[in-house]
A protein has these predicted regions:
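Acidic, surface-exposed loops and disordered segments
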Residues: 2-220
């Protein structure tokens, strides 16, 4: 089943764009008493995948560790300094890139055509333009492409979670070569991009200092 349209939600608690974006902070210690039910976690992901992706390939995959067993698996691949997050968060979401997303590309656009979103001519044009590039691509290209798509989704997930009233911590400190197999996925297909702890902060997070924009900008 392909849901191409963005999901509208009734769970948004904070619809203040400025607050969601500019007051988001990473949290390392969560309130362990706070639990997020799976229905809301699924809604958060449903909203997350309205993020943009190259050629609408949607090259992302999510593993949600929200049980004791799942968290134990997550902890087994995390670096020790990230244990406080997994021990206290409501759930940890691993965002992975799917290097084989192009194999179902026809299904996505055929569905769009059936629903009258695009004409058969436009669909065929899309197939001719983009599919050969991916079908003949190197593994390195497919991995890089999937990581870009999934990075877009990961950032969106941080903001969607905050809009739902939750705090997050994006994590890259894990054994990347063990993530897929730990969760029963094909490591040749799925490449880990980020782990995201989600829950409610146990205390007010520290505000970080940022570089001035002029220090990291070039105009030409």
């Amino acid at each position: 089943v392909f849901n191409i349209t963005a999901t509208m939600t009734t769970n948004i608690k904070n619809n203040d764009f400025k607050d969601v974006v500019f007051n988001r902070q990473s949290v390392r210690q969560f309130d362990p008493a706070v639990k997020i039910d799976r229905a809301e976690l699924q809604t958060i992901i449903d909203e997350t995948i309205s993020a943009p992706s190259a050629c609408n390939l949607q090259s992302w995959h999510f593993v949600v560790a929200d049980t004791a067993e799942g968290k134990a698996k997550a902890k087994s691949v995390l670096m020790k300094f990230n244990y406080p997050q997994i021990d206290s968060c409501s759930a940890m979401i691993f965002v992975l890139g799917d290097t084989q997303s192009h194999l179902v590309y026809r299904d996505v656009w055929n569905k769009a055509c059936e629903e009258g979103r695009i004409t058969p001519e436009k669909r065929d044009e899309i197939f001719k333009t983009f599919l050969p590039m991916y079908e003949n691509a190197t593994p390195e290209f497919l991995q890089a492409d999937a990581m870009i798509d999934s990075s877009m989704a990961a950032m969106q997930l941080l903001l969607i979670a905050r809009a739902h009233g939750y705090d997050t911590n994006p994590i890259a400190g894990y054994a990347a070569d063990k993530v897929a197999t730990t969760f029963g996925l094909d490591p040749k297909r799925y490449v880990p991009v980020m782990a995201i702890a989600i829950g409610k902060a146990a205390s007010q997070p520290i505000t970080t200092t940022r570089y001035d924009g002029s220090q990291v900008t070039e105009f030409c």
